[in-house]
Every structure is written in structure tokens, then in C-alpha cells.
């Protein structure tokens, strides 16, 4: 599908993953979180969050970084079930993730292959596109750099916990979008394709 522009009236889910490392082929998802945005409004009551039980133990440095321990995931859903639940939450929404082209979407694709889950195509945007559109080649398009530029507070949300990161990212996306299109009618950011599990139910 050729990239095209999209507007904020669309049903959007901003999401984030936490994992045991940076390699989709070698590491595992341990947390998925998402929050819905419609018409430029963050719909906090429509949110999703789950820990995910990996096959291997969570390394200590990942626990130190994310706050997620082996105790958190001990009774969590298996990856296939967690991804199917996330797919049900997403529905027909367009997905947005930060650095998602290089991180989140490859992890989802790899996990669908690993767990033999058939996939469906959804609209997808890497929120770094908003940052690059606003600030061009300036150094730093990470979420912390964007928070500093937008003077955003974390409002007590824990960074590197997917539940906290999606709340912060939703606020950042909303502010960047508003700067690009004050009435949220149009956004000069291309919409690409992502995948999530096909859910027959």
C-alpha cells in the first residue's frame, strides 16, 4: 500500500513494548501497553496493558531499567495470547509507536512468526516522523529529547514502563500534531503499514 496522509479523526492507538533486549530475533516481549486517541483527544479510559511471560528469565539489567521483574511476569499471559488480546483492543485503529519502525513493529512481526500467528495489516506511523517534521535534522528525536523540547512533565509516570511511556508519548504526539496542524484536521506525516495478529473473534 502506498503511503498516504491521515487525519486525527481516525481511530488511533499509541502503543509501546518493553522487551528483554534490543534484538527481535533473540529477545522477548515482556510488556505491551496502548492508549486510544480520537480527534486529537486522548481517551484514557480506553487503554490496554499487560505483562507478557517470556520463555527465559528477565536479565537483572532489564529489571533495573524497566522496573519489570520475573515476579511481574510469572502469571502473565503467554506471548501469543498477549498479542491476540492487544489485537482485539486495537481493532481497526491506526498504530503509533516511537522508534516503532526499528523496534516495536519488528518485535511484533518476529513474535507472530515465532508463535505461528497469522497477521493482518494495519496503518502504522513511527512518531519520530512528527519530531523530524517539526525539528528536521536537529540532534535528538528520542522521547526524552522531545519531552524537553515540548517542556512536557512525566506527571509521575514511570519511564521505560510501557504503561507510563504510552501516556507520555500520547501527550507528545498530541502536542507535535497540534503544532503541525492546529485544528487536528490534517497531518503531513505519511501513513505506512504495520502488522498485528489476525484475530478471528
Regions found by a protein language model. Give the residues of each.
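Conserved non-catalytic scaffold segment of RNase H-like nuclease domains
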Residues: 2-122, 136-160
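Acidic two-metal-ion nuclease catalytic site recognized across multiple nuclease folds
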Residues: 2-4, 149, 170-201
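A short, structured active-site edge motif that brings together acidic residues
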Residues: 121-132
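Acidic donor-binding loop at a coil-to-helix junction in glycosyltransferase catalytic cores
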Residues: 164
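Short secondary-structure transition/capping segments
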Residues: 83-85, 167-171
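Short acidic/polar capping segments at secondary-structure boundaries
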Residues: 101-102, 130, 153, 174-176
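Active-site phosphate/pyrophosphate-handling residues
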Residues: 106, 129, 167
Amino acid at each position: 500500500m502506498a503511503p498516504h496522509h491521515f487525519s486525527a479523526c481516525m481511530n488511533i492507538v499509541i502503543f509501546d513494548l518493553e522487551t528483554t533486549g534490543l534484538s527481535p530475533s533473540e529477545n522477548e516481549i515482556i510488556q505491551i501497553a496502548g492508549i486510544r486517541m480520537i480527534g486529537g483527544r486522548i481517551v484514557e479510559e480506553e487503554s490496554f496493558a499487560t505483562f507478557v511471560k517470556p520463555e527465559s528469565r528477565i536479565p537483572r539489567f532489564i529489571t533495573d531499567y524497566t522496573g519489570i521483574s520475573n515476579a511481574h511476569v510469572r502469571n502473565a499471559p503467554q506471548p501469543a495470547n498477549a498479542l491476540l488480546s492487544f489485537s482485539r483492543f486495537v481493532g481497526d485503529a491506526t498504530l503509533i509507536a516511537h522508534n516503532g519502525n526499528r523496534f516495536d513493529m519488528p518485535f511484533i512481526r518476529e513474535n507472530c512468526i515465532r508463535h505461528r500467528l497469522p497477521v493482518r495489516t494495519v496503518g502504522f506511523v513511527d512518531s519520530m516522523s512528527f519530531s523530524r517534521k517539526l525539528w528536521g535534522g536537529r540532534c535528538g528525536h528520542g522521547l526524552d529529547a522531545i519531552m524537553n523540547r515540548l517542556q512536557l512533565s512525566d506527571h509521575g509516570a514511570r519511564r521505560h514502563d510501557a504503561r507510563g511511556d504510552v501516556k507520555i508519548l500520547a501527550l507528545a504526539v498530541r502536542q507535535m500534531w497540534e503544532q503541525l496542524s492546529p485544528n487536528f484536521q490534517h497531518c503531513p506525516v505519511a501513513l505506512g503499514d504495520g502488522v498485528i495478529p489476525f484475530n478471528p473473534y
